[in-house]
Amino acid sequence: MGPGWAGLLQDKGGGSPSVVMSDTDSDEESAGGGPFSLTGFLFGNINGAGQLEGESVLDDECKKHLAGLGALGLGSLITELTANEELSGSDGALVNDEGWIRSREDAVDYSDINEVAEDESRRYQQTMGSLQPLCHTDYDEDDYDADCEDIDCKLMPPPPPPPGPLKKEKDQDDITGVSEDGEGIILPSIIAPSSLASEKVDFSSSSDSESEMGPQDAAQSESKDGQLTLPLAGIMQHDATKLLPSVTELFPEFRPGKVLRFLRLFGPGKNVPSVWRSARRKRKKKHRELIQEGQVQEEECSVELEVNQKSLWNYDYAPPPLPDQCLSDDEITMMAPVESKFSQSTGDTDKVMDTKPRVAEWRYGPARLWYDMLGVPEDGSGFDYGFKMKKTEHESTIKCNIMKKLRKLEENSGVDLLADENFLMVTQLHWEDDIIWDGEDVKHKGTKPQRASLAGWLPSSMTRNAMAYNVQQGFTATLDDDKPWYSIFPIDNEDLVYGRWEDNIIWDAQNMPRILEPPVLTLDPNDENLILEIPDEKEEATSNSPSKENKKESSLKKSRILLGKTGVIKEEPQQNMSQPEVKDPWNLSNDEYYYPKQQGLRGTFGGNIIQHSIPAVELRQPFFPTHMGPIKLRQFHRPPLKKYSFGALSQPGPHSVQPLLKHIKKKAKMREQERQASGGGEMFFMRTPQDLTGKDGDLILAEYSEENGPLMMQVGMATKIKNYYKRKPGKDPGAPDCKYGETVYCHTSPFLGSLHPGQLLQAFENNLFRAPIYLHKMPESDFLIIRTRQGYFIRELVDIFVVGQQCPLFEVPGPNSKRANTHIRDFLQVFIYRLFWKSKDRPRRIRMEDIKKAFPSHSESSIRKRLKLCADFKRTGMDSNWWVLKSDFRLPTEEEIRAMVSPEQCCAYYSMIAAEQRLKDAGYGEKSFFAPEEENEEDFQMKIDDEVRTAPWNTTRAFIAAMKGKCLLEVTGVADPTGCGEGFSYVKIPNKPTQQKDDKEPQPVKKTVTGTDADLRRLSLKNAKQLLRKFGVPEEEIKKLSRWEVIDVVRTMSTEQARSGEGPMSKFARGSRFSVAEHQERYKEECQRIFDLQNKVLSSTEVLSTDTDSSSAEDSDFEEMGKNIENMLQNKKTSSQLSREREEQERKELQRMLLAAGSAAAGNNHRDDDTASVTSLNSSATGRCLKIYRTFRDEEGKEYVRCETVRKATVIDAYVRIRTTKDEEFIRKFALFDEQHREEMRKERRRIQEQLRRLKRNQEKEKLKGPPEKKPKKMKERPDLKLKCGACGAIGHMRTNKFCPLYYQTNAPPSNPVAMTEEQEEELEKTVIHNDNEELIKVEGTKIVLGKQLIESADEVRRKSLVLKFPKQQLPPKKKRRVGTTVHCDYLNRPHKSIHRRRTDPMVTLSSILESIINDMRDLPNTYPFHTPVNAKVVKDYYKIITRPMDLQTLRENVRKRLYPSREEFREHLELIVKNSATYNGPKHSLTQISQSMLDLCDEKLKEKEDKLARLEKAINPLLDDDDQVAFSFILDNIVTQKMMAVPDSWPFHHPVNKKFVPDYYKVIVSPMDLETIRKNISKHKYQSRESFLDDVNLILANSVKYNGPESQYTKTAQEIVNVCHQTLTEYDEHLTQLEKDICTAKEAALEEAELESLDPMTPGPYTPQPPDLYDNNTSLSVSRDASVYQDESNLSVLDIPSATSEKQLTQEGGDGDGDLADEEEGTVQQPQASVLYEDLLMSEGEDDEEDAGSDEEGDNPFFAIQLSESGSDSDVESGSLRPKQPRVLQENTRMGMENEESMMSYEGDGGDASRGLEDSNISYGSYEEPDPKSNTQDTSFSSIGGYEVSEEEEDEEEQRSGPSVLSQVHLSEDEEDSEDFHSIAGDTDLDSDE
């Protein structure tokens, strides 16, 4: 047999086809031919060598590839056939033409190497193969598999299997297969048990490597292996060693050349050689494998029988005897391994099971349920986990082959494969490095702390000796300490150390070496790691003296037992609960971790998937409004009937009512058809708004018991009806059937109260709330009318539900909270996304107006912020003024949009704003109901008002927190929606009990009981035992107790009796507060009581009375109760005291009545308790009285009678009605309730008396203690502070109080002194010292001790008295330092903006627009050189050439200083940048081009906002308005505010008379009038002439004369006001006359225009005054040379100059150069004609000169400086056409001819301090003179409105009352806002006015 055959057979055992042939074959094949190739038949004829004949179409490469295809098995089939023919004649190997080589002489004969037990039989079988070829031989069972496999391979060899880590059993069979014809060989094998680890080896790789090694090397390695494993291999003959067992057979864990693991070799039960272990099991393994093989082997054997028909030998054997028929061999019994008693036969033996049924222990363990489901029998037979056994072969042979191949691979490849030992943990860690061989080596190193205590003492720098080490480790040196009884080293796990646990690893469930048996948990009581029981008592401490806690606990243990027996305290279940519960030993699944947690809200029972309608999910407009005003919020969920403007119902008259029965049936049929068409089943029909109508489907009515529920659904949202049912214990009949809803069986209640067994409660449930509902029968007379625009529809109603109190499941956000703001933002974003989806344009686009219309309360900036995320604003092109969707932005899908905002979030937000509106209507400000911070929430809850506490954001948060266990609810209180105790109050209270804060008497200061008779430590044992006998404790129990146990029982029982108010020895009571457990229990009981009460009341079908008389009587009772409560609050008396006083008063009154009447016959009509005799019922209504006699029983048991007399007719009627209509039971309950109330009062009285008694005793004890100390002087109650006003000198208010008469005066010098007065110092001394009771001065002998507080207060008074306060008006104007020109951080930080700035100030708005334009110019590319001023050090000659430098930073600072009242001045300075660049750099320079682009951008921005800027400029300068009415109203308003209101003591006429203070004023005065009303009329332009204005002014005087009389001081003040008004009007007579004339002319022109417009539609629009009316040839225009301001045609002007000649002149005059140059070039300017109004407003020459010289005095108060433009048009068209040519318009500082003291407008400071004046003012009516660049001052300044002072509170009130004003705007600088002496009138412009 040659090596080639070995290679072939090894390939059949699982090798790769590429190495089937020998080296010679490989060489020939590589040459191109290869062996006999059967594949050549596919492409033509082949020659004798098996190659294609002739020149075929295939080249050499294709032929090679074709030869390679022979690996599919065709070539091997022919090779085997030919080989069989040649082998039939001879045993030796033959040389084949195809390259099969002959065996070498020195080849090892593998056929002799065999297993020990089968050597003879195999050799016999081999030699007798030719004679006995039949299968059924004597020993045929052993090789049944191998023979059939071999024959099967001869007929049709299988294709080679793919390489893999595991091979099938059939391939493994081929390795050791033996052919009976002699061609099969047996590879050498070593007997060893199978190892699961060997199966992991890659068979293909090992076989490949072995084939590549060559047969000679393989044989050598095998012989070397044999020498290592066979016994005496080097001494005995080779054949003799084969007959002896090998080392691996005796010791399966032996590895040649490896480290011996003695625990594995000689472990427990493993030290006996396993020689006999496989002696009897060999045949059985084969038999088991045959049984498991089944049908496959039978088919193979049938094929073998057909082939071997000539073999006629048959052997008949008797069946093997049963095991019980044979005697067991003692040696086998002794040497056999100990089998597990729990294991069962898995088919590996032939013995018959015992007839007795045997129950496997694991069968009825914790997995019994699963075994029952799988049908496993009791004995557990046949249970295999679904695993499959592998087909058993000679495992030792396979394992030997695998090891041999691995070694060959390792030797050839040079790669060292990791041995098994390398994977042990001991080889993974470098534990050798941690061994301390010498203590000196680690002396200077620190040992590892976790190992130091186990290693013991080692000398180091820290622990030089053992004592120091013990101290460091915390050990004590005493030997008496208890040592631990266990080893300090961890305990070894014997199963891990000695057991073969790795055999139980499942490597392949389909290829198991044996079937695993279910393990049984066994607890070893000797296992030190197991704690099998809990110790009963706590272990004593290790110290010699027990601790105080342990002593106390042991001593109090008996007293607790006694108190539990007597029933004083309950047995404490929490101690038992604290112990761990005994777990089921079979419950190994950690079920406690899967139980539902109680932290969250109680989950909804059953499925709670709420599917809203499509319109609701998409938040469509009618159902989910984007904005709700105050009216809609007040009508929230209570919509009024809508009045239709069109449709059938818009017309009056009778309308028919349509029935809906047919429509309902028709709609139901249509929906059923639709459902059937879609395939049946459930279907969702609420898809469109039309589906939400009430005209079809089933309807129910639900009436909510709460007036304003915390949460309400919107239209289209779904709600489920759940029927909660709690089963009865034992046999339960099931839940009753309900018409609506789904039944849910609940064990724990989803409500605050629990359900009773057998109780069913229906509930509304959705994502917002859960609320119980109660079905009521609808009266048959009721029906439903549906009103639409088309008509009326009627339908029936069957059922109505009453909805109980809601249990919120969704938290309502607080106002202005983060959640609310986030919802507003997301809601707006969702609306924008839906608008884009609706857009049909491409790209999609929307308008800002659509969003502003839907969200009017949102500012444009917030909307723009949302839009910028997804869209761009287009200013030009096709999409101009549209927001176009960004190209790179993906619109969210519908599902994503729905996820952003849910309908529940909208409902919560609506509930919040509706409640907010209700609170505002009730008078609460916004700050009062802000949501509190979380950490201070409990304190905040105690401080807020009751109405705010009932707001939904507070109640829902409280309920949800209570459900999570974070707090408790108040249950009864202000948040009860019913108001009568039938609902829950959702207000947070802490979990721990707190002292009740009722309106009781103030409790006295609790003093310590130490040293008093209430001190339990002073109570003798004898007295204590006597107290116990009084308490009823048995004598035998008392004897068992020690002293402190007796004291404990006394204290506990006294406390219990003191709580109930009955304890005679309550002085020994301690800790009257409830424990947490009692508090929780009372809370649950109270919740259950209210829950049951609510169910009873709301489910009641009793019809309530609606009698008006009874309700009025009840109202009167409520009023009386309210008065009683007020009295209680004022007097701080208890209700018992009040009732006693009231009874005493009634008794005395009755006595007086009896004495007055003189009749004593009323004593005959006696009735017992609560019975009455009614007298004089038939008397007249005026003289009726009711006498009620009541019999009482006092504390001693004596009876006495009291008589009550009632004279109120309503009370008499109510009493008689109750007596006549109600039965005795009702009256008894009513009286019983009253009796219960009295009983509570009685208990309260006892408690208070006991406290008073205790106080008296304590006071007496204090008197007896020592000499009476001097009592502190009793301080009188501090009266109200008598503050003296600093302005008027009156007492009772301060100068900042608006009740001060001089509060509104501004021109009068302040009368408050600079320093503090003596009276103020005295008042301050009283206020500084807070604690009046503390003795501040003590006299001890000759020493006087001053209190620390007294010294501190004196220092504080002295410090405050030294402060001098100067009014700002009296201070000289400060010169502010000019800010440097280089502000480095200008573009890094935004400027600080005051939070108090006026929002509606047009100057601020204009400045913000201009600043945004500056930002846009700054963002242009390459504009950096113009951002900041030019550095003079870098560019030294710049300021020599440029005299007026300008840059963007300076421009920004000017804007922030409000220096630009118009865009023309702003543009002029920007144009100055361009001119400077052209002057210095040249007109063609790149920097000049960049500056020109900045100017172009500015012009573009100004043109975009042309209309808005024009309106702002008009608002800044009202006198320049086109309308003369505005100027007229402006002058009148200044007369009122600065002249009439400045009259001393005129404050009573400033505002309307308060009706509360003067109740009869409006009865006397029919037409009231005041200065504020006049100002309102002025702002509304109601006065178009002075006559109408004077009529109202005179009406003030007439009203004062009428009400106060002509001699009253008020009348004199009113007369002075009228005189001032007449005087001022006379001064402005000429100007006002011209304005009246112009207003009248404009009116007439408007009327004429209206008439002409009706005739001729082409008539031009507004009236244009004619030149003769406007011009006066005698006037002249004075020109200021420096006032060169560039203005465009859109500048505001007082007059219009439509003359074409004037425009031409102005255009020529303006020029396009610098202002100064233009003046020099043109010389004199032709003066245009001025109007009469212009002439009136011209200043005198002297004043003009003063203005030009800049020499205004501080006392100068010019009326105003009007900015006039000579441009003739305000139209946008003309301004656009004239934009390139900027006309030069001259501005004049004009003022009316008035005296200085009569002026209405004043400068703030002189001309030199112009920058301060500009900062302080928003209004500029004067010209702006360019400052000298070298100076810090300006020639002129803008004036601001001075005079009339108004407080901020009054401004707010005025704005709320009268709305915004149009007169003036003043912005206070920060300095002036901080000053309390400067106030300015500030109204709003007509831009924001609604009027």
From Swiss-Prot:
Residues 197-208, 1764-1778 have a biased composition (Low complexity). The modification Phosphoserine is found at residues 328, 1690, 1693, 1799, 1802, 1820, 1847. Keywords: Acetylation, Acyltransferase, ATP-binding, Bromodomain, Cell cycle, DNA-binding, Isopeptide bond, Kinase, Nucleotide-binding, Nucleus, Phosphoprotein, Repeat, Serine/threonine-protein kinase, Transcription, Transcription regulation, Transferase, Ubl conjugation. Residues 1-34, 154-180, 197-224, 535-556, 990-1009, 1128-1148, 1254-1278, 1651-1676, 1690-1891 are annotated as: Disordered. A motif (Nuclear localization signal) lies at residues 1372-1379. It is found in: Nucleus. GO terms for molecular function: ATP binding; DNA binding; histone acetyltransferase activity; promoter-specific chromatin binding; protein serine kinase activity; protein serine/threonine kinase activity; RNA polymerase II general transcription initiation factor activity; TBP-class protein binding. Residues 538-997 are annotated as: Histone acetyltransferase (HAT). The keyword Magnesium does not apply. Residues 1397-1505, 1519-1628 form the Bromo domain. Its cofactor is Mg(2+). Component of the TFIID basal transcription factor complex, composed of TATA-box-binding protein TBP, and a number of TBP-associated factors (TAFs). TFIID consists of at least TBP, TAF1, TAF2, TAF3, TAF4, TAF5, TAF6, TAF7, TAF8, TAF9, TAF10, TAF11, TAF12 and TAF13. Interacts with TAF7; the interaction is direct. TAF1, when part of the TFIID complex, interacts with C-terminus of TP53. The Bromo domain mediates interaction with histones that have acetylated lysine residues at specific positions. The second domain also recognizes and binds histones that are butyrylated and crotonylated. This is Transcription initiation factor TFIID subunit 1.
